[in-house]
Amino acid sequence: MRAWTVLLLSLGAVFILSGCSDLGFYWQAASGHLGLLNRKQDIRELLNSPETSPELKQKLKLVESVRTFVIVEMGLPDNEGYTGYVDLGRPYVTMVVTAAPPLELKAYQWCYWFAGCQEYRGYFDENDAHSYAAEMKQQELDVSVEPVTAYSTLGWLNKPWLPNYFSDPVLSTFLLQRDAELIAALIHEMAHQVVYVNNDTAFNESFAVFVEQEGLRQYLIHSENTDLFEGNRENIYQWYLSAEKDRRLFRQMINTTFDKMKIIFAAEISDEVKLQKKEELFYKLRENYDSQKNEFQVLSYGNWFKQKLNNTHLLGVQRYQSRVEEFALLFEEQQRKWPQFFDAVRELANASEK
């Protein structure tokens, strides 16, 4: 029996247990992922093929180099994950819907049989995402729909007893980025295989962000494959440092607005006044960015600020960064040793799930 048939039969049983309300969502998730896997090509075969463009070969060699480094030097799981490649033919892999109450900075959560509760809901089809977002708006929620360039199965389908067909692939969206961002994205997705806490998106994403940041730094310092980079290694790392400085400035703006918004929502004033003050805060946030945008060195957030901002946008920034410093401190406490650090993170994860 073909591998995809086995998965479909397994998912079919889950659909029956999950009930009709989620059937459409799980079906699009399964069929979308299987459609992606059906297009996966082995990276080694692509590198050996005369039909593969030199540009793609260069990027795939960099992927192989990073993957080997993080497995050997950092101790990330050694499995069949990220040994295949998928050309998506578009600049995103899924569209993600997020939601929040209009007068509360608390993300709406969706609970899944395979991953616990998360603060987002992903769709492979953009129209499906916008249709679902419209349904959520009818519940008088703040809603946003954003493109996502990467996702992983958290290592669940990279098991040695499963056919390589199921393993997570490298996506063409990784390769559309600068080398520093490509390296960071790959490390981030591989880090999700180390630990995953049900119902705690901030823990999972902040952990992966820290691992990507430190992993990128170590790779650029210690890698001997300097011929794989676009430009020299020092320039790549300096670009990444500049990008991190830009992200910190952006986060400072968002965090300031976030804190002020919490005060407004907690105040003993009418909901109508709260909504008015909320819009005033977003207006001031845009003004603040306009006055400081020349301070950004390599990144621009102009498109982000062109959106009709709501609570989901503030929460989205918090989701990926709120606990990064905590993991950085833990790494130092473990003498910057990856095995000890990962063990300590697993202990934290186990404690939080009790």
What are these regions (language model features)?
Residues 7-18:
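Bacterial N-terminal signal peptides
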Residues 33-70:
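Amphipathic alpha-helical packing elements
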Residues 39, 59-66, 128-132, 182, ...:
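Stable alpha-helical elements in mature extracytoplasmic
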